[in-house]
Each structure stands twice: as C-alpha cells, then as structure tokens.
Amino acid sequence: VGHRLKEDGWTVVSLSRSDVDLPWSDRHIAADLTNAEASARALSAASDATHVFFCMWSRQATEEENVTVNSAMVRNLFNGIAEAPVQHAALVTGLKHYLGSFDDYAQVTPYTPFLESSPRLPGPNFYYDQEDVLFEMAEARGFTWSVHRPHTMIGFVIGNAMNMAVTLAIYATICKHTGRPF
C-alpha cells in the first residue's frame, strides 16, 4: 500500500513498534500502540494525517486477551491523532471475521457464502472489537471508513509467522532438500 500511495504522490507516514527504514515512507513513527501514553507522545508527529491504514495486530494467549489488546491498539492510534484532519480510515482484518477466532476455529459453523452483511459469529473475536472502535471513532469524528478482509496477505516482515511468502519459501526449501517437486 505504501509503495502505491507514494507512486501516486501521497506523503506517507509509516508506523510500527520498531524504528525501521522503509524506502517508501516519508516519515516513520516508532510506537507501541499497546501503551496509550507512549502512543500519544509518538503520534503527535502525525497530527496532519488525513488517511489511516490500520494493518497490525498482536497475538495474545487467548481470544479475550486478543480482544483487549487489539481493540486498545486501534483506540490508542485514533486517540493519538485526535486532532488530525482524518478523512478516511481503512482497517485490514481477515478471514477470521467469517470463520471465527483461533480459539473457535472449526468450532462454530460459519455463514456461507461469506457476505459482508452476514451476522457476526458467536464468541469473542478481536476483529469485531477493532471494527467497533473504528465505527465509534468514525461516527464521533466524521470520517469515512472501510474494512478489508483478505484471506491471505503476502508481505515481507521478517519473523512474521503469518507471512505467506515465508511459508512458501520454507516449503520450497524443504521440497528442494528432499528432492520433491514444488
């Protein structure tokens, strides 16, 4: 997303827990969104943000903890840019919206076909709580929103166990090592 926005002439401000150098980012902010006070201090550098793309989550031991931590991260981001002239916010979640949380995978029957208008599944699901915070902030501050629920993300973050590119690379390496076709 950052690459494309930059190509289209946008000023891109990136955010992550660590201080990284991203070639497509005009400015990078290192902030731990699980810490409200630290987030607010760090996000003062994004007081001019007009569009937000929220694409992060933090895996916790239980879904109840996922709900608490991940909804707080969305809230802390928006509270940290409370004075920014935000026009639109895009939240990226995923397939667990339709299939249930990790704790409930294969325990509840999903509604099929998957439709954006389908009711939420029973049980805790941090995606739902992230959406609720987004909806609350959008209504209070007057910006538009969108939610994107891709099945698979292919990225480049080292150490991300949910990175499909890493999964395919490991599988290809095993196939090569064992002499099996890929």
Residue ranges and their predicted role:
Residues 133-162:
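Conserved beta-loop-beta element that borders a ligand/cofactor-binding pocket
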Residues 51-53, 65-66, 72-126:
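Conserved Rossmann-fold NAD(P)-dependent oxidoreductase catalytic core, especially the SDR/UDP-sugar
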Residues 13:
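Conserved beta-strand positions in the Rossmann-like core of class I SAM-dependent methyltransferases
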Residues 1-10:
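N-terminal Rossmann NAD(P)H-binding glycine-rich loop of SDR-like oxidoreductase domains
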Residues 170-182:
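A conserved pocket-lining segment of Rossmann-fold NAD(P)-dependent short-chain dehydrogenase/reductase
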Residues 20-80:
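NAD(P)H-binding glycine-rich loop region in Rossmannoid oxidoreductase-like domains
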Residues 34, 97, 153-155:
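Conserved sequence/active-site signature of Rossmann-fold short-chain dehydrogenase/reductase
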